[in-house]
Regions:
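C-terminal accessory regions of radical SAM enzymes
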Residues: 45-100
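Radical SAM enzyme core and accessory elements
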Residues: 79-167
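Radical SAM enzyme [4Fe-4S]-AdoMet core and its adjacent flexible, acidic
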Residues: 1-69, 109
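Residue-level detector of flexible, active-site-proximal loop/helix-junction positions
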Residues: 19-21, 77, 102
Length: 167
């Protein structure tokens, strides 16, 4: 993948296998960690150096000796919750302030009921300002991690599937 990305001028992102949504076969043993990725890439391409930057992006960026830049999203072994500024809005108007959230805020109903733009802005700002979501960090502390959401719950609430919220 990295060779292909380099050929087409794309900056590739690798992501650790996450225990979210329908990852019903997730286990820590199946996770290729950021460190594992860096080791494998270093052996294949030479020394890998970190690209130091102040950003809220979920990927940490790295450079190969030939100048190729790539990123790793290490949300399983080194979560980025402290700097996360992401949220997700589903196609049917549910707003989630964390990828790991099991509850969201219904924005469709108030919008369809005629909520003013100012009131909607206040609602969103109020919810965001009280945000305490740290889903990946909280999961990091669990020694016996199973999938975040059991398959039976996914059938009852499709919003819990990552593909419905862009995860």
């Amino acid at each position: 993948l990295l060779d292909y990305a380099r050929r087409i001028g794309a900056e590739l992102r690798f992501i650790e296998y996450m225990d979210v949504g329908g990852a019903t076969q997730w286990s820590r043993e199946r996770v290729m960690s950021r460190q594992d990725m860096l080791t494998v890439l270093g052996l294949a391409y030479g020394p890998v150096t970190a690209v130091i930057e102040d950003t809220s992006a979920p990927a940490d960026r790295f450079k190969l000796p030939d100048g190729t830049i790539f990123g790793i999203i290490s949300s399983t072994t080194a979560p980025f919750c402290h700097s996360c500024d992401r949220s997700r809005l589903t196609a049917d108007g549910m707003w989630y302030r964390c990828l790991y959230a099991t509850r969201g805020t219904d924005l469709r109903t108030p919008i369809r009921a005629g909520m003013s733009q100012d009131d909607l802005l206040r609602l969103i700002a109020g919810e965001w300002s009280t945000r305490a979501d740290r889903g990946a960090e909280e999961r990091l502390g669990i020694s016996d991690r199973s999938p975040l959401v059991p398959a039976s719950s996914l059938k009852q609430n499709p919003h819990l599937e990552m593909h419905t919220r862009g995860g």
